[in-house]
């Protein structure tokens, strides 16, 4: 893309949550690559956090953006969930939904789909309330800091979740590798990292504005996770991609990894 890498200042000034949600999360039943990507992530998360899956007390979601779908599956398994994002607007959008404020984004279709995966599409309202109760805080995050949640200091978590965010925050493979190490510092030994990464994505559109990414290969992501001190328990490489006019990625990688117990 033209110009330099779009860093935090550009996100703070120009990233509009409603444009982003309209582009990537209009889950209205009509078929689209974006809807299929959302389904893919919800299915992976259901398998990861559903019956017999990961559970614990605390989960930190890094780079939540203005979305809540990524913690729908986990709210039955974790009682203390932290959402986080770099930009004020995204955090405000999250708070609107959590507090049921007028004009909050309607996540009902995604919540209903998540409940269908659990075999009970009728309990979607209960699911929303369970999630609202489980989310204890919405914090600012910066994955380039040694403590990505600074100045907040939280107890080490059982799980760190980050979907479709790290590749947008990092300008290079080295920056991505360093950021993964920062995320690892938030986890207990033996805790889990759960992440979806869009592959070979140079940039993506939000409204009429283009935001840059680091274009990662599956092997680079895999090695970065290993080098950050994790053992990979699951790696799913899918050809799932967005509409080329929105985000010209080439597949995605879903990973569940366990932080090594220590030296």
Curated annotation (Swiss-Prot):
Q: Which domain of life is it from?
A: Eukaryota
| Compartments (UniProt record) | Cytoplasm
Q: Where does S-adenosyl-L-methionine bind?
A: 20, 25, 63, 69, 85-87, 90, 142-143, 163
Which InterPro entries does UniProt cross-reference here? Answer: NNMT/PNMT/TEMT_CS (IPR025820), NNMT_TEMT_trans (IPR000940), SAM-dep_methyltransferase (IPR053384), SAM-dependent_MTases_sf (IPR029063)
The entry's keywords:
Cytoplasm, Detoxification, Methyltransferase, S-adenosyl-L-methionine, Transferase
The Enzyme Commission number assigned here is 2.1.1.49, 2.1.1.96
Q: In which tissues is it expressed?
A: Widely expressed. The highest levels were in thyroid, adrenal gland, adult and fetal lung. Intermediate levels in heart, placenta, skeletal muscle, testis, small intestine, pancreas, stomach, spinal cord, lymph node and trachea. Very low levels in adult and fetal kidney and liver, in adult spleen, thymus, ovary, colon and bone marrow. Not expressed in peripheral blood leukocytes and brain.
Q: List GO molecular-function terms, semicolon-separated.
A: amine N-methyltransferase activity; N-methyltransferase activity; thioether S-methyltransferase activity
Example GO biological process: methylation
Which SUPFAM superfamilies does the record cross-reference, listed alphabetically? S-adenosyl-L-methionine-dependent methyltransferases (SSF53335)
Catalysed reaction, written as an equation: a tertiary amine + S-adenosyl-L-methionine = a methylated tertiary amine + S-adenosyl-L-homocysteine + H(+); a secondary amine + S-adenosyl-L-methionine = a methylated secondary amine + S-adenosyl-L-homocysteine + H(+); a primary amine + S-adenosyl-L-methionine = a methylated primary amine + S-adenosyl-L-homocysteine + H(+); dimethyl sulfide + S-adenosyl-L-methionine = trimethylsulfonium + S-adenosyl-L-homocysteine
Q: Which GO terms describe its cellular component?
A: cytosol
Pfam families, alphabetized: NNMT_PNMT_TEMT (PF01234)
Which residues are recorded as modified (N6-succinyllysine)? 13, 96
Its subunit composition reads: Monomer.
The protein's role, per its UniProt record: Functions as a thioether S-methyltransferase and is active with a variety of thioethers and the corresponding selenium and tellurium compounds, including 3-methylthiopropionaldehyde, dimethyl selenide, dimethyl telluride, 2-methylthioethylamine, 2-methylthioethanol, methyl-n-propyl sulfide and diethyl sulfide. Plays an important role in the detoxification of selenium compounds. Catalyzes the N-methylation of tryptamine and structurally related compounds.
Q: Which NCBIfam families match?
A: GntF_guanitoxin (NF041360)
According to its UniProt record, which protein family does this protein belong to?
A: Belongs to the class I-like SAM-binding methyltransferase superfamily. NNMT/PNMT/TEMT family.
Which PANTHER family does the entry mention?
INDOLETHYLAMINE N-METHYLTRANSFERASE, NNMT/PNMT/TEMT FAMILY MEMBER
Protein's name in the database: Indolethylamine N-methyltransferase
- Read off the lineage from the record: Eukaryota, Metazoa, Chordata, Craniata, Vertebrata
| Primary gene name | INMT
């Amino acid at each position: 893309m033209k110009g330099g890498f779009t860093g935090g200042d550009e996100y703070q000034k120009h990233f509009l949550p409603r444009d982003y949600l309209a582009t990537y999360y209009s889950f209205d039943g009509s078929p689209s690559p974006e809807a299929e990507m959302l389904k893919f992530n919800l299915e992976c998360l259901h398998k990861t956090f559903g019956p017999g899956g990961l559970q614990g007390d605390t989960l930190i979601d890094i780079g939540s953006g203005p979305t809540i779908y990524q913690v729908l599956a986990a709210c039955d398994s974790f009682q203390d969930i932290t959402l986080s994002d770099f930009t004020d607007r995204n955090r405000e959008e999250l708070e609107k939904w959590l507090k049921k404020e007028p004009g909050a984004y309607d996540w009902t279709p995604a919540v209903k789909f998540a409940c269908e995966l659990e075999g009970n599409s009728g309990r979607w309202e209960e699911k929303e309330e369970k999630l609202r109760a489980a989310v204890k805080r919405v914090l600012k995050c910066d994955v380039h800091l040694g403590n990505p949640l600074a100045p907040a200091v939280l107890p080490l978590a059982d799980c760190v979740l980050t979907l479709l965010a790290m590749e947008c925050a990092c300008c290079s493979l080295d920056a991505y590798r360093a950021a993964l190490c920062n995320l690892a510092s938030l986890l207990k030994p033996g805790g889990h990292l759960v992440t979806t990464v869009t592959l070979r994505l140079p940039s993506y559109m939000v409204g009429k504005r283009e935001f840059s990414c680091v274009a990662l290969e599956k092997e680079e992501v895999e090695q970065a996770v290993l080098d950050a001190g994790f053992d990979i328990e699951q790696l799913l490489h899918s050809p799932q991609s967005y509409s080329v006019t929105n985000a010209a990625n080439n597949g995605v990688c879903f990973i569940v990894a366990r932080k090594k117990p220590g030296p």
